Each structure stands twice: as C-alpha cells, then as structure tokens.
C-alpha cells in the first residue's frame, strides 16, 4: 500500500531529524556556537500537525527557508512559525512542550504561548493569507519547508545561520538537509522551488534538477530590502514570485 503524501513527508522529516541530531555535536564544537536544538524533536507534535493539515492540497510550488529563528519555528515547529500565525492562520493546536536540554537560558521554549512574535514569520504568513484569502487556498498553491531544522545560537543568544559556519562543521548536516529537500520535491511532485533569500535558492540549485528555481527577498527585519518603503517593496516582491 502506498503511503499518503503526509505520511511520506513525516517519514522524511524524522529521518532528517535523526541525521541532524547526529551532526549536532560537531556544530557545538565550533567557537561561535554555544547552543543547538532541534524543533523536529521537541516540537514534533506541532510539526506533525503542520504536515497532516496542509501537505495534501496539491501544491506544486515550494517556498524554501533557511533555518529556524528563536521566536518562530523554534517555538512552534513550523517554518516562519510566529506563534500568532501558527495559531490563527495555520490552526496549530496546543501541545505540551518543554524547553529541551541544551537550550539557551535566554531563549526559553514556550511553544504557542510565546508572546514575542517573530517579525519574519509575521510578514511571511500575513502576505500569504492576504494574497490567497484562506489557508486552504494558500496550500493549494504553495508548501513551505526550512532547509535546515536546527536552531543554532551563540553564547549571547545571537542566531547563527548555516552560512556563518565553515563547511567542515556544517556539511554533514547540510547533506542530510539536501536529501530531505529532494525527498520533499519528489514526494509532492514539486515543479517550482522559491528560495526565501539567496542562500536557500543556492542550496536548491546545488541539488535539484528538472524543477524551476527562483528566489524572493527574505522578510527578516535585518534585511534592508525587507524594510524598504515600510515593507511595501518586500510585499510586492513576494507577490510577484508566488503563483
């Protein structure tokens, strides 16, 4: 019996999670890294809901993020998962969640009760909701994954992205992330991958064939492009890229 799309995606995500856990200690040895946690482990109950609820609407365009931030996917297990967006747009329901061992003491894991809202995630899901009108229509057109699921933080709590780390440190994890990306594309029959930022686009270009690859500006408040004209230019760019 052939597994459903959601079951195949969950299997792929669990394989990725296991591979990332195996590569965690290598990342922790780097001088810029103090804490590494895996939302696919401690927030699996949220991520599983995301896959079960929204992967079966036939989307053929994949929006590809980079890795979690401390106030988004780190809390909700959902890419760009600002807690209000996860509750109100994605209809993610409460699950008990505990701060995992190895978490940064200044970046506690509170799950859906986290009051601070990730700006990137708020911008990201808000534009999709405004453009498509309903969550069902969003996921009839697009699906979303992060390339890497690990939250990587420095001693002060600064977010460390995969691009900040040398190849020798991050490569084993990135290879697993590449395999996962290819699996998602194959399972869903994805025809277009849109990198949210140039890093994600480059990862897609390095490992994917026979799909159209593009990019959109990243919604991070650290990006001048995302903030230009009060965010209007970013919104216009996003709408010009999505189907």
Where would I find each of the regions flagged by the language model?
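Short hydrophobic/aromatic-enriched beta-strand-loop microsegments
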Residues: 211-218
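A polyanion-binding, active-site-adjacent surface
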Residues: 3-192, 201-202, 207, 224, ...
């Amino acid at each position: 019996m052939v597994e459903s799309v959601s079951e195949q995606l969950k299997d792929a995500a669990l394989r990725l999670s296991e591979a990332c856990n195996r590569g965690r200690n290598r990342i922790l040895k780097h001088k810029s890294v103090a804490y590494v946690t895996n939302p696919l482990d401690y927030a699996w109950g949220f991520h599983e809901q995301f896959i079960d609820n929204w992967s079966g609407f036939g989307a053929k365009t994949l929006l590809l993020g980079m890795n979690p931030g401390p106030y988004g996917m780190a809390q909700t297990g959902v890419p760009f998962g600002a807690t209000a967006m996860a509750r109100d747009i994605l209809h993610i329901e409460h699950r008990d969640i505990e701060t995992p061992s190895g978490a940064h003491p200044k970046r506690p894991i509170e799950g859906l009760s986290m009051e601070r809202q990730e700006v990137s995630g708020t911008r990201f899901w808000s534009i999709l909701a405004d453009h498509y009108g309903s969550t069902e229509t969003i996921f009839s057109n697009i699906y979303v994954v992060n390339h890497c699921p690990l939250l990587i933080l420095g001693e002060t709590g600064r977010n460390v992205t995969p691009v900040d780390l040398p190849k020798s440190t991050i490569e084993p994890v990135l290879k697993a992330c590449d395999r996962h990306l290819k699996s998602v594309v194959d399972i869903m029959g994805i025809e277009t991958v849109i990198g949210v930022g140039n890093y994600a686009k480059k990862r897609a270009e390095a490992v994917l064939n026979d799909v159209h690859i593009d990019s959109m500006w990243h919604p991070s408040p650290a990006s001048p492009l995302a903030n230009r004209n009060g965010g209007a230019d970013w919104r216009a760019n996003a709408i010009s890229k999505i189907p």
